[in-house]
């Protein structure tokens, strides 16, 4: 992929979509291509044809359509749409088919801090025994339609997987119940908060709390640029990738810069 990579944003009129569009407009590494929204003059096929990479932060039904179009005209895809592919078998199958053709990055939250937060939650899920109750609490702006957020759902899935693999315990979502292991999940939609996710591990005598708070939506734009850097630099093979796969490059680069600074 060349330095003049054209990037199209699906869902370009949404809150996150606008942030990504702004980040691309200010970038010297990438060219903002035509995007797609409800008011687009171009068809989805035309938008795909005019771009080298697609970034999708839209709606599960539209993302499903995007994947179907890309199976005909393959392009690398970054998906940040909440609830995709969800439990829809057809969406899962189409996405899997696309990953055999092009690299696809699925990232419910594109910020570096969210990735670090998730890693910490994974570690605590391994270390905290079943005597610790677990609570996930997420807060977003009043206009956010989805509840649970994609990031909170990803944290929930991560905790359930780790508890199953490391402790052999099945955790369900719900209020605390002595007869089964549960994870309490709370959602709040207030004000203009870009996003806050908090996971608590609570025993009878202590609490461990990890929280990630977004102060500016610009972090999502920077995160997408980091993923694009990864695509351009490594030119990965077709496959399904996570934000963690792409941010390892960013973390290594930052470590090298820090080492150079301290060496001087």
Swiss-Prot record:
EC number: 1.17.1.8
SUPFAM superfamilies attached to this UniProt entry: Glyceraldehyde-3-phosphate dehydrogenase-like, C-terminal domain (SSF55347), NAD(P)-binding Rossmann-fold domains (SSF51735)
Database matches in InterPro entries: DapB_C, DapB_N, DapB_N_CS, DHDPR_bac, NAD(P)-bd_dom_sf
Residues annotated for NAD(+) binding in this entry: 11-16, 80-82
Biological or metabolic pathway of the protein: Amino-acid biosynthesis; L-lysine biosynthesis via DAP pathway; (S)-tetrahydrodipicolinate from L-aspartate: step 4/4
NCBIfam families with a match to the protein in the record: dapB
Family: Belongs to the DapB family.
Protein name: 4-hydroxy-tetrahydrodipicolinate reductase
